[in-house]
Amino acid sequence: ESGEDFYDPYFFISVDCYCTGAIPPSHTRRDLFPGAVAFESLHASRKDRFLMRDIPFRIEYKDQSYFDSLLHTGEAPEGAFRDTGTYMLYRLRHGTVAFKRSDWIDEARKDLDALNQDFWNMLRTAFQARMEHFLGDLHAAIAREDELFYLVSSSGFIRTACSVLFVINH
């Protein structure tokens, strides 16, 4: 539903910008969108948010070298998927390309498809362990009748289950 209603508070257009090196300062990026209002930049997380023609946009600047390292070695840095799960890989693989200056995205997708089964097994094992952790948290939340902890634990369980499904169906 929110995908069709621009005024739904959950609706926004999310853009991943894969880049190399340092990103330009926020004022330079803001100047690239002259019609934008309410521009805010989160430099620590390399994200910009703004409204253009009443449509909310979120741009996240992603370092190509991080993905190159992951895709060429098949090894993820410790905690690489802890907060995002496999969502970043899903977006890399299935996101719609609106603009590209090189064939990097095409090559990255080929590299993602070529990752060996050991990589996917490692991810599956890690995410299944997290699912078990969240399942234990759910049990504790039910036993203590803690609605907030139940909500947090169930969201973690569902998100991790989605990561397991992505890994299985990669």
Per-region residue spans from a language model:
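Small-residue-rich helix-loop
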Residues: 154-159
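Glycine/small-residue-rich interface belts in oligomeric ring/scaffold proteins
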Residues: 20-22, 26-39
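Short helix-adjacent coil turns
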Residues: 142-149
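A short, ordered amphipathic alpha-helix with a cationic face
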Residues: 124-128, 152, 169
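Short, surface-exposed helix-loop/turn micro-motifs enriched in polar/charged residues
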Residues: 7, 149-150
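Conserved NTP/Mg2+-binding pocket subregion across the NTase superfamily
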Residues: 34-142
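Active-site nucleotide-donor binding segment shared across nucleotidyl transfer reactions
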Residues: 1-24
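Charged/polar positions within long, soluble alpha-helices
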Residues: 136, 143, 162-170
